[in-house]
Amino acid sequence: MSKSRRTRSTSRPTSRPQPASCPCGLPEVYEACCGRFHSGAADAPTAALLMRSRYCAFVRRDEAYLLRTWHPRTRPAEVDFDPRMRWTGLEILGTTEGSAFHSAGTVTFRASYRGGALQERSRFERIGGAWVYVDGEFFE
């Protein structure tokens, strides 16, 4: 009586890697979250979402988006990215106004980076219906 040899496949089904969630901290993939704002497909409907999308733009070093969403009155000629800076998280601490029904608003946030964090209260205004960053005040 001969024994037949069975060979067992040791390969596992290949699964596609899951897309990473957006750097802004919301549980959506970048393309469905801040990516749509960065590409120009949509405008951020609130000051808080603009803040998140700008944080994400700093993470991705998207200078064009940052300049496009900066108030013309306070916009710098260029964004000075620190090549050593590694952003690690964003926490929205509070907002005042800044909804689709307002023309101005503030967002207070903590942005963490490798080695520390910064806290800022940012001011936003609407120009032609689109939210733009005006300026911010750092605090501890």
From Swiss-Prot:
Pfam family, one: YchJ_M-like
UniProt-listed InterPro entries: NTF2-like_dom_sf, UPF0225, YchJ-like_M
Region (Disordered) location: 1-22
Secretion signal, residue range per the UniProt entry: none
Composition skew (Low complexity), residue ranges: 10-19
Source organism, top-level taxon: Bacteria
Family from the record: Belongs to the UPF0225 family.
UniProt protein name: UPF0225 protein SAV_6631
